């Protein structure tokens, strides 16, 4: 996530050497603003040209569940326009900034033409999950040692149906969960 320059400088050469595919999720403002520590559009094009899937993470990486419907649409539209201008196409995949979303954000991401979206909740994708609510295992300097990696690649899903509440954004803690 986030198109940090360290991905281009350190992670990508390792992934490339071992022929491991990956997706880079990009918020366009930090790239447009040439924010230190982030990639450039040229580096993103190099990754794209070498088989890396480029996904969207919005325009400004906001807490999208706090935005109005119009602001959500603006975040998605401006970001998509920048991708079309800079890399010649709109990403098919979306990662919710901070992994946070509610039903309104999910619906707008879907309406905007993305084919799948990812949160930041750890878990294994399985057939009972919605394609716009896909989990991921974080792999970074804090949660990326070999034990964590082995746990993630060997994890099995716990298929749950009839999850309650339907809205993934929990405002009450402790929440009242129900599932079968």
Residue ranges and their predicted role:
Residues 4-8, 45, 49, 59-62, ...:
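C-terminal active-site subregion of NodB/CE4 polysaccharide deacetylases
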Residues 21, 53, 115:
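Residue-level detector of anion-binding/catalytic polar loops
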């Amino acid at each position: 996530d986030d198109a940090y320059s360290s991905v281009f400088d350190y992670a990508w050469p390792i992934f490339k050497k071992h022929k491991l595919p990956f997706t880079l999720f990009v918020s366009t403002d930090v790239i447009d603003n040439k924010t230190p520590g982030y990639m450039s559009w040229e580096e993103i094009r190099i990754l794209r040209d070498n088989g890396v899937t480029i996904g969207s993470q919005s325009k400004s990486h906001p807490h999208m569940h706090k935005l109005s419907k119009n602001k959500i649409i603006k975040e998605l539209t401006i970001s998509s326009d920048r991708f079309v201008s800079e890399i010649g196409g709109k990403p098919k995949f979306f990662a919710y900034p901070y992994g946070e979303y509610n039903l309104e954000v999910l619906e707008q991401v879907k309406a905007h033409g993305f084919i799948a979206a990812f949160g930041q909740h750890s878990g294994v994708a399985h057939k009972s999950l919605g394609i716009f609510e896909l989990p991921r295992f974080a792999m970074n300097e804090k949660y990326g040692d070999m034990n964590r990696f082995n746990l993630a690649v060997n994890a099995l899903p716990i298929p749950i149906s009839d999850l309650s509440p339907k809205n993934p954004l929990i405002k009450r803690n402790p929440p009242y969960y129900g599932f079968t």
